[in-house]
């Protein structure tokens, strides 16, 4: 768990809680990883290198209300928000989320492209 917190601090990932969640996701594209201290082996390591989005993590063990509100059934789960609204969700399969940094970045880039075309 300490490794998760240290990597988050070093790479600009905001630790999200009930107190700051709404404020942190209300503007722009925000990518949030929901994780649990009992499953740190499968946190999404490529998550911290994403560009053009704000990054946040929610420890569901400490923020059960956010887990319930966002209907998190398995960790890790990654939710992409834009201006406070969910637009994409990726959920783990048997506690492991199989994705690449390129796939994650493409979701962000595609959304930015759609916004530019408006």
Where are each of the predicted segments found?
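Hydrophobic h-region of N-terminal signal peptides that target proteins for export
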Residues: 4-12
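Short gly/ser/thr-rich secondary-structure transition/capping motifs
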Residues: 13-17, 58-60
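Local sequence-structure signature of Cys/Sec-based thiol-disulfide redox active-site neighborhoods
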Residues: 15-51
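Solvent-exposed loop/turn segments at secondary-structure junctions
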Residues: 37-40, 61-63, 86-87
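Structural micro-motif
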Residues: 69-82
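Non-catalytic, surface beta->alpha helical segment in thiol-disulfide oxidoreductase systems
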Residues: 80-118
């Amino acid at each position: 768990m300490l490794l998760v917190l240290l990597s988050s601090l070093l790479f600009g990932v905001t630790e999200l809680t009930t107190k700051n969640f709404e404020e942190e996701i209300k503007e722009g594209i925000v990518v949030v990883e929901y994780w649990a201290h009992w499953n740190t082996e499968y946190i999404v390591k490529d998550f911290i290198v994403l560009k053009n989005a704000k990054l946040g993590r929610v420890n569901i063990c400490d923020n059960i209300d956010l887990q319930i509100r966002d209907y998190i059934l398995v960790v890790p789960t990654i939710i992409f928000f834009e201006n406070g609204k969910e637009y994409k969700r990726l959920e783990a399969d048997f506690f492991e989320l199989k994705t690449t940094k390129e796939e994650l970045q493409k979701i962000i880039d595609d959304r930015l492209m759609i916004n530019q075309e408006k």
